[in-house]
From Swiss-Prot:
Compartments reported by the entry: Secreted; Host cytoplasm
A Pfam family matched in the record: PexRD54_WY
Keywords: Host cytoplasm, Secreted, Signal, Virulence
Family (UniProt): Belongs to the RxLR effector family.
Short motif (RxLR-dEER): ranges: 46-61
Organism (species): Phytophthora infestans (strain T30-4) (Potato late blight agent)
The name this protein goes by in its record: RxLR effector protein PITG_16705
Main location: secreted
Signal peptide range in chain numbering: 1-20
Organism superkingdom: Eukaryota
Domain notes: The RxLR-dEER motif acts to carry the protein into the host cell cytoplasm through binding to cell surface phosphatidylinositol-3-phosphate.
Organism lineage: Eukaryota, Sar, Stramenopiles, Oomycota, Peronosporales
Amino acid sequence: MHLFFLTAVAFVITSVSVDASVAKDPRGHAPNRTEVDTVNASSSTRLLRKNSTVDLVGEERAPSIVENIKALVKSSAVTPAKLQQWLDERLPAGLVFKNMNLDEPNIFSLLHEPNFAKWVQYADDLSAKSSHKESSVISTLTSLHGDKVVYDTIQAAKLYPQLSELALKLEKDQIRFWIATRKDPSVVFEALNLNWAGISIFPKPEFSAWLKYVDDVNARHPKEAPLSIIPTLKQRFSRGDEAGTDVLLKLIANGKATTEAKTVANKVESALFDFWLNSRETPDKVMDAFKYGTTTQAFLGSPRWKEWERYLSAYNARYPEKKATAIETLTRKYGDAQLLDTLIGASSKGETKTLAAKLQAQQFDRWMNLKESPLDVYNRLRSSYGDTAFFNEPQLNVWVSYMNVFVDKNPSKVDKMFLELGDTFGDMRLFRVLGEAKKFPNLESTATKLQMEKASTLFASGKSPEGIFKVLALDNVGDDILSNTLFHKWLAYLQKFNKEHPNNQESWFDMLRISYQPFGVERIIETGRKNPLTRLMAEKVENAYHNYWLDIKMEPKTAFRSLHLDESGEKLLADPKFNTWVQYLKTFNDRYPNEKTTVIDGLRDNSHDIALLRMFSAAKNDPSTEKLATDLQSALILKWQDAKKTPEELKRVFVGVPAADEMLDRYIKLLAVASSTP
């Protein structure tokens, strides 16, 4: 029985081999007997080593099928009738692909095979009969070679005239196949060779094609969870120390700034927002993405802040039950104290000043909605600032601003509020608060009244004016202290104290000087001069300041710089402070006759002669300083004479200085007169 079976198999193989040889003979006639016998003998020998049979149409083959039988079956001629038979039987395109001997490794060579076009038509006809319309051509090729290889092959084939029509068809089929199977965007991204596009990716046509692909998939499958481009882009651009989202945001910003990429950049940005919204990303988390790598203050002044606000609005519209505000988000992330510092810093810069004021008002509204009194806010903030720092500017000003808002909403609570503050703070801190509160309309009246009541108690104590000066917070009033009522009351108290304590005199100027330092005293004088009511007091402060310089024996050349006259340039002689300095120089000479100096010496200590020549020349054009300039020119010429300067030496020094000619002429004449005098 076994021998009979082998004989039967050999007979079948012989028949198939003959048919195959006839079909494949390019000359179109049957092979001779010798050729047939050779094929039969070879095939029979190999088949005797196998133990199984094969289905010639390729529907189901066991792993032990004889390789030679497979080759012979594949090499059989595929006639239109055979294709029709397979089509009627709805034989899968993948099996027909193998039956037609098309499953060779080189896919590009495959496109040149005549049978390939026949197979493509077969696959299309089969798809037309099927309820699933996706291309079995692309499905088969992809299963063998992968998406990217198939795509690259199609793109290469488009360059050949004889293949371009077929390639264009396959290109469309591949896209339809991807859409039908909801191919992962990252796979298509790689297939389109976008992994190597770099930061110039947005203007590329392949990128636009990829965006359209994702849109088409979502339109084709509305009941499925929508695909997003964002995970692919984030993964692609996640490199180094920068998060993928941050790089993507930079690409979007750069793209929106160019004409060629603006549309694509807006589309990607919209997709990013949709991705966040669909993922229920909170405004807090999205803020981290927008703020990545920068300070909060810089973030507030950047375009990304506006984009974040736009996301906040979109989030609130999508999830009204989880509605968030900018100030709540910032407070959750940074806390009241850190946020307060950030807003203070932002308020000092032009580009963020308006936004800082808006957020500050929202912070106040939030505290009001929480029904927090100024004392409640103080108790919360003090843990971050400490007792000392809290009472310094500008934190104190912001907190007192909230007091003003609180009283505006609760006018009947103003007295109680100040009473609570008085019980909480010592006199020194309370006076600091009261001094700030007087600047606000809702607080001014009560603060002034309480301030005077407390001050009267202090003045009645007979304590040192120096100590009371600090308790009254007069060391923190600022440049306009000379117009401060409490300061004048303190001056009156000091005069009374000095009369009552002749052996323990205290100086009002020392308190100003120590508290405000030199630059502060100068600003006090300048501010006081501008107000008719305080002008005399400003002059009194200035005189006291100069007397202090004399007491410490400050040289006129140093006083020159202390008055900032070295910054006046060619207009020095017209500067009012110049006369002040000249008067100081005279007073200094009177007090210290052994260290007398002159105006020209003081000028030369602070300027080169070249600069002085230019200054004198400019001053002579002003009638108010003409005589002074001429006198100083003469004084300078005498200095040259004392130093035995020669005209030739001076000419070399002043070469190119227009104002030097007149001075040199005068000097030469002086030397001539001196030489003729016995």
